[in-house]
Every structure is written in structure tokens, then in C-alpha cells.
């Protein structure tokens, strides 16, 4: 079980994600991105080994309330998982570049290629995933690796040192055939931040 604080970017997928995480026996707190950073940060500090999760949402990362500033405040100290808009915000907060995909993907299933490591270990290759987005990551930040693609589009990234990862696709969608398994692996991978820190 993990202690997860989910930042809600006011999206219809948020509570699908909450339900999936709670079904996996995780403790989940939800705050909207309109809540002040101080309140959210104080809640994170009260949790044992917290994970910050950033939900999907509309628009651009810079228009998503406190999200970018919150990432910058906790990165390196608290593991972060971003989905769709949350993924884009992680890339931007760490210095990467986000741009338009050239077309809108709304409820589209695509077959992605992945590296078969960490959260993708033991899942099919290629992997069917759900996509709802018009933005993509054009340039990844330093210390991040690309761990999945659709054609030439970046579909996910991870930073093994900070235990920060982002997914352009939706693991919580029924169109992502192994989404529940992937989400469990994501939470396990993020939680290793605290085990690694103890050894240092």
C-alpha cells in the first residue's frame, strides 16, 4: 500500500484513476490544482513515504493551477507520477519542451513500443494504450530516458534518480489493456525512492 496525493487537474478521468488506485489498496488523498501549494505541501509532509500523482486535464501545463510550481517545489524529494497533462507538466518543469502533436487524439487506441523495463516489464510488445491528447513532448529533460514511443512520438519518460515518471497515455482507461498491471508497477517503482534513499 502506498500513500498517494493526487492532484486533480479537473478532468473526467480523475476519479477513474482514484478508484483504480484504491482498488489496489492504496491510500489516496485528492486536491484540486486550485488549492494553494502550502496546503498541498503540508499534506504531503504528513504522509509516510508519499507519492505525488498528477492527473490528466485540459489545456496547457502553465494553465493547470499550482501544478508546475508544486512539481518544482518537491522534485528530487518526493516521487512524482504524471499522466497525460501531468506527464507534460513534469517534462516542462524539468526543462523539456512540449509542443502540439499536429492532430487531436481523443479516445484513440494505439500500439506503442516500450523498453520492457520497470513499469513495462512483463507486458505485451507492442502494447495497446488509450490516448486523449493534442500536446506531446518534443524534447526530454536531462536525466530522463524515453521508455515508450508511438512511431516517433514520445509516450512515456522516467528519471530513475528522482523516481519521477510521466505517461502520455492513460493507464486507467479500459483501452489500455494492461493498465492495472502497469499502474501497480508504477507505484512500486516510485516507492523505491525511499528504499534507495535509506541505502545512501
UniProtKB/Swiss-Prot annotation:
Its EC number is 4.1.3.27. It catalyses: chorismate + L-glutamine = anthranilate + pyruvate + L-glutamate + H(+). Pfam families: GATase. The active site is at residues 84, 170, 172. Residues 3-196 form the Glutamine amidotransferase type-1 domain. Pathway: Amino-acid biosynthesis; L-tryptophan biosynthesis; L-tryptophan from chorismate: step 1/5. GO terms for cellular component: cytosol. One of its GO terms (biological process) is L-tryptophan biosynthetic process. L-glutamine binds at residues 57-59, 88, 134-135. GO terms for molecular function: anthranilate phosphoribosyltransferase activity; anthranilate synthase activity. Keywords: Amino-acid biosynthesis, Aromatic amino acid biosynthesis, Glutamine amidotransferase, Lyase, Plasmid, Tryptophan biosynthesis. It comes from the Bacteria. Coiled coil: none annotated. PANTHER family: BIFUNCTIONAL PROTEIN TRPGD, MULTIFUNCTIONAL TRYPTOPHAN BIOSYNTHESIS PROTEIN-RELATED. Heterotetramer consisting of two non-identical subunits: a beta subunit (TrpG) and a large alpha subunit (TrpE). Part of a heterotetrameric complex that catalyzes the two-step biosynthesis of anthranilate, an intermediate in the biosynthesis of L-tryptophan. In the first step, the glutamine-binding beta subunit (TrpG) of anthranilate synthase (AS) provides the glutamine amidotransferase activity which generates ammonia as a substrate that, along with chorismate, is used in the second step, catalyzed by the large alpha subunit of AS (TrpE) to produce anthranilate. In the absence of TrpG, TrpE can synthesize anthranilate directly from chorismate and high concentrations of ammonia. This is Anthranilate synthase component 2. The gene is trpG.
